[in-house]
Amino acid sequence: MKVVISACLLGVRCRYDGGDSRNEIAIEQKETSELIPVCPEEAGGLPTPRPPAEIVGGDGDAVLDGKAKVMTADGVDVTEAYLKGAYHALQVTQSSGATHVILKARSPSCGCGDIYDGTFSGTLTSGDGVTTACLLYTSPSPRDRTRSRMPSSA
């Protein structure tokens, strides 16, 4: 089985703060799957480290619809970079033949179900990140849109 996975979950130091989000449960998937790492934010041209960013005015679906933006904490609009990264992740997923995707929780790119609310206050709201929304939007059928949660590593 081929699985596209957020690179930070594999220990790649590509988080906004220059760190990683290494997750042993995700890493163990390599025993039964071919893991294909991707960092949509770096693929979109953003540096590491970079200022924190959140979706302002909605969620990933709203960004795809042009109704919300991804902004950094210092007020820079990075929406285009997030869109570019999402489309890159989609291309990697499709061209690799991946059947599953494991993405970083709460990220403005990869969040699934919960993202930060755009106020930079640490408050969560329901919604998906831009990459997650892009992948779900292009999913061939509703049965493929199953969400599962993996325990987060601290």
Question: What does each of the following model-derived ranges do?
Answer:
Residues 8, 104-108:
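Short, well-ordered beta-to-alpha junction loops that form the rim of enzyme active sites
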Residues 11-18:
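Short N-terminal binding/cap micro-motifs at the start of the first secondary-structure element
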